[in-house]
Amino acid sequence: MELAMLLAKLPEAYSVFNPLVDVLPVIPVFFLLLAFVWQAAVGFR
């Protein structure tokens, strides 16, 4: 029974990470831009 209570409290515990979860999908776009900037820096060899 205490396991069910623990699982019920988990969403409240993870509500702190909501801003982080909102940012996570943007990270691959940053990697794409980083690759483009890197290639521009080396002259698209």
Curated annotation (Swiss-Prot):
The keyword Signal does not apply. GO terms for biological process: photosynthesis. Residues 1-8 form a propeptide. Keywords: Membrane, Photosynthesis, Photosystem II, Reaction center, Thylakoid, Transmembrane, Transmembrane helix. The chain crosses the membrane at residues 24-44. It comes from the Bacteria. InterPro entries: PSII_PsbK, PSII_PsbK_sf. Disulfide bonds: none annotated. It is a single-pass membrane protein. It is found in: Cellular thylakoid membrane. One of the components of the core complex of photosystem II (PSII). PSII is a light-driven water:plastoquinone oxidoreductase that uses light energy to abstract electrons from H(2)O, generating O(2) and a proton gradient subsequently used for ATP formation. It consists of a core antenna complex that captures photons, and an electron transfer chain that converts photonic excitation into a charge separation. NCBIfam families: PRK02553.1. Belongs to the PsbK family. This is Photosystem II reaction center protein K. The lineage of its organism: Bacteria, Bacillati, Cyanobacteriota, Cyanophyceae, Oscillatoriophycideae.
